[in-house]
Amino acid sequence: MATIMIGSMAISVPNTHVSCASNSVMPVQAVQMAKQVPSARGVLYTLKREGSTQVHKHEEALRKFQEAFDQDVGIQRRLLVNKHSSIQSTKKNGLTLRRLTLEQARAKEAAIARRKQEEEDFLNGKYEQQFYAGVSATKSMKFEGGSVGFRTKYWRPTPKKTKERRATSQCRKPTYVLEEVLSIASKSGKLVEFITGKGKRVKVCYVRKHGAILPKFSLPHEEGKYIHQELQYASTYEFLPYICMFAKYKSINADDITYGDSGLLFDERSSLTTNHTKLPYFVVRGRRNGKLVNALEVVENMEDIQHYSQNPEAQFFRGWKKVFDKMPPHVENHECTTDFTNEQCGELAAAISQSIFPVKKLSCKQCRQHIKHLSWEEYKQFLLAHMGCHGPEWETFQEIDGMRYVKRVIETSTAENASLQTSLEIVRLTQNYKSTHMLQIQDINKALMKGPSVTQSELEQASKQLLAMTQWWKNHMTLTDEDALKVFRNKRSSKALLNPSLLCDNQLDKNGNFVWGERGRHSKRFFANYFEEVVPSEGYSKYVIRKNPNGQRELAIGSLIVPLDFERARMALQGKSVTREPITMSCISRQDGNFVYPCCCVTHDDGKAFYSELRSPTKRHLVIGTSGDPKYIDLPATDADRMYIAKEGFCYLNIFLAMLVNVNEDEAKDFTKMVRDVIVPRLGKWPTMLDVATAAYMLTVFHPETRNAELPRILVDHACQTMHVIDSFGSLTVGYHVLKAGTVNQLIQFASNDLQSEMKFYRVGGEVQQRMKCETALITSIFKPKRMIQILENDPYILLMGLVSPSILIHMYRMKHFEKGVELWISKEHSVAKIFIILEQLTKRVAANDVLLEQLEMISETSERFMSILEDCPQAPHSYKTAKDLLTMYIERKASNNQLVENGFVDMNDKLYMAYEKNLLRSLEAGMARIKLVGKIFYNMAIEKICSTYGEMFDKESCRRKQRIFRKLCECVLHECPVTPKKCKKYTFPKM
């Protein structure tokens, strides 16, 4: 580019060269051409228009349905009657409507409308403001004469009686009723009685014999009475034709008549009548010299007659079966099959009969009278002597299923108090004393002297006297004021306890290992329900952390993998210590001012705490023994090479498993069933040591041999107020205190109310966590009907958790969960159904009040009623104990608040209740919002499905985009993938 200098400034000159334009044309490819893409706004408008059309159609259908519903006269009448009908209870604690007539319902509806109109008129000022002149009706004080009547206010005139005109019956023949009765009897087989002269009765029924329907008389020889003429023809001939009128005879020969045919009636249509009697009727009695005998004729020599009543065996079986079928057991849990022969059944029936009612002949009246005239003591001696005389037979009978219980019942009921000398000594020491305590001792001694013969009233009186003595003794106990910790020493025994069950050679195999026998087979009830299998191939890491309600503990199960390097092996012997607590008052237990050493923590010689050490794990063992070296017992060999660990909250099952070692083999089934069906449902997860000790005491009552059973080592965590029952997987966490109790008998001392100890309230876990789980399950299920039905069927007491908040009660009432609970439980358990009815009534009262504190006051007032009903309900559901504790808290809080108010103080927890209610409302609102959004999503899905069904399809790219948006929306709101049931990660929107 050229420049021009003007002075000192350089100015550029533009280029004057002009370039020529090119005439070449560039070709345009198909890819570069524009495409026609449908507008997204048009698609959305189409969807919106189709959605509006469908909504309009739906609203129009609802309007037509409502019009048809309102125009249906029958339905409106029923609704009107049900609206004004009152609710009344039935005899079976149910509820029903006491329906009014249509006129009564209309009258009530008119009265309500009239009252409402009057109120509206009054509020709108539609009334006349004027004065009314009149005379007041006052009684005159002046006495004047007058007539006095004797009619009271209850007098009513006697109504005139209307004479009823009875319709004249149609003229029928005199035998009409007789024929109708006999016709019914021939069809149903009912018994008919004819009363003849002098009060004599003749019984007739129709039976099927020899392929025919024949009349049958009840003859005296069938009841054991033998007379010359069993039926008098002169007194029965009048109704014999009518009896035969409804019989259906067939060709029956004389040879066909046999035992069981006594009393059969034949007329002249049968050859039996024409060939064997001169009378027009023949009633079978038997045979004499091969010829049939007529019961209507007189027979001189009755000894020659072979009577054709049923044989004695059939008669006996008929009576036995009749009573046997009337007295079946009340429990039916299977379908009966024929597993034994009739001979074996007869032996069993005879053995039971002769054990309770020993006679030489059941048909002998003197044998029965002999037992009848015996006194109770003589009868017991008679049974004992009879049992002693037939000892060998009893040894054989005991092999029959259930006969040993019969023998035990007899031995128990006939046992006598063998320690009469001791009872007489008590009488000698207490006689001539009239003080209350001596009289109570005398009443108790009288009941003990009688033994099994004591009556229920005497036992009740003795129990009351023993309770009174116990209360008196407790009130007079004194405690020492000496400083316990200065002198407290509780050294661990250096010697191991001796367990006779582990020393008996009969219970050990050739290797010296304990043989479980039947105990091992029945122990499956523990392992199947409360233990989980440890699979080594999946690793042990998920079992290392053992959580409890207030903390956690590490198991040494990981040390089952042994390193071959010495240095690493030595590192596996080092534990992880918790904060070591010194000996405090929470470590000791006292009763009557004295230490109860088995219920205290172990100390060294100088009084310092003995801390737990690392416990190495083992495979498939039960580890017992708290003093000395532990004892390792192989687990029952039911499933080879399987390892089990107790589920969280059920580690106390190791105590019951250790007790099973000492249980007799024939009682192992009863022991394991009682633990599974009675003990564990009441204890639940993480029970207190007080409850565990009480459960152990209940088991020792039925199985006394378990009192000296050795316990697994129990570690005490004072920081978390928890006790850990150590199993074969040991403990990597160290530094806990150690409980000294070594046997079940020592552990039972925790169950005493007199024991002063903090440790008996420690958890073997915690109730608060269980309660929070129940509340969360209830809140998340209110708007999910399927989950709520599962809760109502399996664990109905969770609904009592709704008492923590009036809002939860109101939402459950609106969702009609209480009505559903009544429907499910009214036929199963009335007590549970009654809980739902009271919850519904309480919610109606709570909803009528808007003040939170007054609503909570209503709930507290109803808690005692809930508690009384809950006592009668089944205790199997897991939430029973949690619900009971919640009601107990309300009852105790109400009592304490009432006492504070009486003393002039005020409850300061008002703001706490309001904050707690707000938190629950947030949870409920979140659930409601989620449900509403789900409804909208499903609604849009339905619209899209309708569009695709009717042919309005979209291109693939648009469909994929909609599916992707819908999936993201579900993930961020529901945290759940709509395609698969697997949980998705929570979605977070990207920042814009």
Curated annotation (Swiss-Prot):
One GO location term (cellular component): host cell plasmodesma
Site feature Cleavage, where: 308-309, 765-766
Enzyme Commission number, as recorded: 3.4.21.-, 3.4.22.45
Molecular function via GO: cysteine-type endopeptidase activity; serine-type peptidase activity
Involved in interaction with stylet and aphid transmission, short sequence motif: residues: 361-364
Top-rank taxon: Viruses
Domain (Peptidase S30) ranges: 168-308
Domain annotation Peptidase C6: ranges: 643-765
Modification(s) after translation: Potyviral RNA is expressed as two polyproteins which undergo post-translational proteolytic processing. Genome polyprotein is processed by NIa-pro, P1 and HC-pro proteinases resulting in the production of at least ten individual proteins. P3N-PIPO is cleaved by P1 and HC-pro proteinases resulting in the production of three individual proteins. The P1 proteinase and the HC-pro cleave only their respective C-termini autocatalytically.
UniProt protein name: P3N-PIPO polyprotein
GO BP, sorted A to Z: proteolysis; symbiont-mediated suppression of host innate immune response; transport of virus in host, cell to cell; viral translational frameshifting
